[in-house]
């Protein structure tokens, strides 16, 4: 599954150098990390639900998730400081490239009513944020075994210096972006 990394080195870097006038290969923006995040929401106190989500995240990413804790108390939400409120996985290197390739080629086409990622999902520093309403689009999840579906967020960080560089990188990587 290392085709994306090889494609980046052989095809994308020369195109980025030509378009933006970089003198060095290392000046071209590249993918830095991919973060997959799930918030537990109203199920915070249900230990079985938390454990189930951790297992699903591990299946999807191939890496054990870490639990995220609340930074401060918010009484209307019945949230206390230090309470576990979600789980996240940070992927770097080869695992990140494998995950992003799977995301582009397998997961996005499996999403119901998917019409592309809005270009506004790329921020001013060239990072992409995508939210999924249900986790069933991932190939590791057997639809028959699922009791309830939940959403997750994926943030892909790049070394791009501007939004234009980030957008061009994602277009060259064949992300299904649509014009806003």
Segments from the language model and where they lie:
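Ribosome-associated RNA-binding proteins
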Residues: 1-180
């Amino acid at each position: 599954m290392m085709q994306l990394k090889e494609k980046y080195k052989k095809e994308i870097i020369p195109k980025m150098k030509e378009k933006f006038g970089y003198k060095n290969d290392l000046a071209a923006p590249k993918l830095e990390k991919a973060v997959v995040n799930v918030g537990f929401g109203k199920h915070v106190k249900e230990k079985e639900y938390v454990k189930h989500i951790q297992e699903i995240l591990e299946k999807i990413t191939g890496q054990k998730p870490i639990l995220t804790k609340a930074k401060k108390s918010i009484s209307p939400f019945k949230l206390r400081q230090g309470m576990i409120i979600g789980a996240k996985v940070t992927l770097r290197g080869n695992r990140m490239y494998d995950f992003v390739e799977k995301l582009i080629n397998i997961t996005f086409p499996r999403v119901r009513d998917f019409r592309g990622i809005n270009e506004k999902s790329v921020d001013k520093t060239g990072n992409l944020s995508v939210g999924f309403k249900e986790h069933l689009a991932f190939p590791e999840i057997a639809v028959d075994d699922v009791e309830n579906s939940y959403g997750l967020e994926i943030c892909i960080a790049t070394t791009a210096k501007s939004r234009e560089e980030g957008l061009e990188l994602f277009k060259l990587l064949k992300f299904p972006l649509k014009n806003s």
